[in-house]
Amino acid sequence: MLRHASTISENSSVFIKLPSDNVRFVTLKPNNTIHLGKFGSFLADDLFGKHFDETFEIYQPKKIRVLKTREVQYIEEEKKTNQELNDCRGNQLMTQEEIDELRANIKAGGLRAEEAIKQLTNSSKTFEQKTLFAQEKYVTRKGEKYLQRFQVLRPCVEVVANYMIEHDPYKILDLTAECISLMLTLGNVKPGGRYLVVDETGCMFLGSLIDRVAGDCKITLVHPNEQPNSSCLEYWGQDFKEDSLVQKGILKTLNWYQVTNPTETLSEYSVEDIPESELNEMKLRHRKRYETKKATFNRLKNTIDDFESGNYDALFILSIHTPMSVLQHLLPKLGISRPFMVYSTYQQVLVETYHQLSKWDNLFVEKTAQSTENDEKVDQGDVAIDTQKEKVIMLDIHEIRTRPYQVLPERTHPFMTVRGDMGFVLSGIKVLTSDSNLAAGRFPKRKGQKETSSVKKAKLEN
């Protein structure tokens, strides 16, 4: 289990939100100084033991304190408007040199940011003529420039996804937090499950899945390269790194060659057993090399055997490859009545996959041993082979769109600019068909059934 700490500790991975709404990723190492540019700097040791999601203020050079929350003040309506005001540089009486001097004093700790903002408002010609709403807006905008405050955010799906969308959206295939949440919900992700994942988003989705169940799951990751690209896992901390997840038994990795050619792969990595007597006579470096190769082979064999056994609880595909080329190898490994999801930034790709999956079927062979009278060992001839077909049902293509709103008294409205492309998800469920004809409804009774029912009625009357 990967449990989240309630307080900040050494070597914690955190996100720092600045007054300008920009977010920075920082690993808090002991005896280290965190620089926030024009917003100042502070010692990482001062954050240890503090709670996440709190807002801090740099009140002196490299010294911070928790900022107390203030009560929301409701502003009464007024008849004054801003129609007659002109927004120009001449409204500010302070020169640029004086403003630069204010910034230098704030950074040096000789002047508080609140006092500097007050000087700016006092030297503005039009500040008093503005409405109360406009005045608050002006102060807030100046606070984004001068206030030396920051908020420490805990790594989670929303924070990491928004950070990657702002910095490198192509690396994660434009995957948003809303899309991740939808896929986890459709996949019925819960603790204790086994999941098959194809993740080419830098393991952005993989980290979200593990975070959702706090590491209580078994995941097989299929990747196209020699080693998986897990660059996004570091944003959740040291416990989420690939080596740590493999060591804890949460993650197993296979590349496409190992998936499509398991026998050839095992033969390439196979190591002959050496007796203990010969091992004792070997040089130390040769023995270590042999033990490393043997451990690698055993680990790979266990991973391939686990993959070949199939019966996964859900299948998630986030890849740049054609979805059907991936599904034809992995869909047979999915358990019966289990969901699968395919993510793509293009709807047409999923529409073609939708039509191909509607015609898809796979031969399902199940061997069942017939019982004998003496309950003896079942021979090969006593094994019955039940052949059925696997199909997919409930195919659907979901378009992800969210509309954030500004929620304020008498000023609630949607944001004017939002992302227009949030991706598409194809979902479905794999089922097992039956050879017999199934029917439901009310049907007329046969002659034999009518006679039997009449006899039962006569007995009841007697």
From Swiss-Prot:
Biased segments, Basic and acidic residues type: 449-462
A GO CC term assigned to this protein in UniProt: tRNA (m1A) methyltransferase complex
Molecular function via GO: tRNA binding
Biological process terms in GO annotation: tRNA methylation
Keyword flag Ribosomal protein: no
InterPro entries: TRM6
Key words, A-Z: Nucleus, RNA-binding, tRNA processing
Region (Disordered): 442-462
Localization of this protein: Nucleus
Domain of life of the native organism: Eukaryota
Function of the protein: Substrate-binding subunit of tRNA (adenine-N(1)-)-methyltransferase, which catalyzes the formation of N(1)-methyladenine at position 58 (m1A58) in initiator methionyl-tRNA.
Family: Belongs to the TRM6/GCD10 family.
Subunit structure: Heterotetramer; composed of two copies of TRM6 and two copies of TRM61.
PANTHER family in alphabetical order: TRANSLATION INITIATION FACTOR EIF3-RELATED, TRNA (ADENINE(58)-N(1))-METHYLTRANSFERASE NON-CATALYTIC SUBUNIT TRM6
Protein name, as recorded: tRNA (adenine(58)-N(1))-methyltransferase non-catalytic subunit trm6
Organism whose genome encodes this protein: Schizosaccharomyces pombe (strain 972 / ATCC 24843) (Fission yeast)
Gene name tied to this protein: gcd10
